[in-house]
From Swiss-Prot:
Matching PANTHER family: 11-BETA-HYDROXYSTEROID DEHYDROGENASE 1, HYDROXYSTEROID (11-BETA) DEHYDROGENASE 1-LIKE B-RELATED
Protein name: 11-beta-hydroxysteroid dehydrogenase 1
EC number, as in UniProt: 1.1.1.146, 1.1.1.201
SUPFAM superfamilies recorded: NAD(P)-binding Rossmann-fold domains
Signal sequence bounds: none
Role description: Controls the reversible conversion of biologically active glucocorticoids such as cortisone to cortisol, and 11-dehydrocorticosterone to corticosterone in the presence of NADP(H). Participates in the corticosteroid receptor-mediated anti-inflammatory response, as well as metabolic and homeostatic processes. Plays a role in the secretion of aqueous humor in the eye, maintaining a normotensive, intraocular environment. Bidirectional in vitro, predominantly functions as a reductase in vivo, thereby increasing the concentration of active glucocorticoids.
Similarity section: Belongs to the short-chain dehydrogenases/reductases (SDR) family.
Transmembrane segments: 8-24
Lumenal side: 25-292
GO biological process: steroid catabolic process
Binding, substrate: S170
Length: 292
């Protein structure tokens, strides 16, 4: 009881105060003006809407996806909306060499990098797991491993700019979902890896923020086609979702929750979890870890 009064209650008070004040921090579109941003999976859906919002805010944008023709249309529209500059590089994230080279090319086009928004996924269908290991491997490579490759390639530039990494994930990466086992596994992997890297940045004073975006069902054409007649759930608008993703990255938030289940942030993003994480980090002797 004495330990709780002396340590835990004051710490909990500090965390509650942090959440209260950080929740009231205001986003301003000019935060993105002139910023150099990469958006993956930007030929349609959420990624395309992210690119359009960034363009309206006056950012430099480099987009990527597999479809060259669609990317050309996205870039043309970004320029009409007011982007400081807009470029595309077409390719597949199944190719890790492309992923690594893409970041270098994008950095040269913009003269640096301030924000890396990782949004791409491979196609996923609702079905019971049928022991298809090839499908699991593809989901993990595209939805997870390519994110790691892109991040490793981008970190030198992001460290120079004190930039941000924004990882678009899913509620399926916080709560296991049936019918999408490989997809869910890849999203859990994103949470585990990037949350760990965020803590490593805190321990080593690396000023590169990592924002994990936990999304519910969003009304993209692909998602609506897949869930039609299978899942009775209201979808949230992709345009607003894209804006919330940008806001979270600009405000350097640890996590962003977006969807029509309003209770999700209260249950999954609670200050008690943060307190436990904080106390856990205090156990690490960073000087010995760095020397090793």
């Amino acid at each position: 009881m004495a330990f709780m009064k002396k340590y835990l209650l004051p710490l909990l008070g500090l965390f509650l105060a942090y959440y209260y004040y950080s929740a009231n921090e205001e986003f301003r579109p000019e935060m993105l003006q002139g910023k150099k941003v990469i958006v993956t999976g930007a030929s349609k859906g959420i990624g395309k809407e992210i690119a359009f919002h960034l363009a309206k805010m006056g950012a430099h944008v480099v987009v990527t996806a597999r479809s060259k023709e669609t990317l050309q249309e996205v870039v043309a529209h970004c320029l009409k909306l007011g982007a400081a500059s807009a470029h595309y590089i077409a390719g597949t994230m199944e190719d890790m060499t492309f992923a690594e080279q893409f970041v270098a090319k994008a950095g040269k086009l913009m003269g640096g990098l301030d924000m890396l928004i990782l949004n791409h996924i491979t196609n996923a269908s609702l079905m019971f797991f049928n022991n298809d290991i090839h499908h699991v491997r593809k989901e993990m490579e595209v939805n997870f491993l390519s994110y790691v490759v892109l991040t490793v390639a981008a970190l030198p530039m992001l460290k120079q700019s004190n930039g941000s990494i924004v990882v678009v994930s899913s509620l399926a990466g916080k709560i296991a979902h049936p019918l999408i086992a490989p997809y869910s596994a890849s999203k859990f992997a994103l949470d585990g890896f990037f949350s760990a890297i965020r803590k490593e940045h805190a321990l080593t004073n690396v000023n590169v923020s990592i924002t994990l975006c936990v999304l519910g069902l969003i009304d993209t054409d692909t998602a609506m086609k897949e869930v039609s007649g299978k899942i009775d759930m209201k979808a949230a608008p992709k345009e607003e979702c894209a804006l919330e993703i940008i806001k979270g990255g600009a405000l350097r938030q640890d996590e962003v929750y977006y969807g029509n289940l309003q209770w999700t942030p209260l249950l999954l993003g609670n200050p008690g979890k943060r307190l436990i994480e904080f106390l856990h980090l205090r156990k690490f002797d960073i000087s010995k870890l760095v020397n090793n």
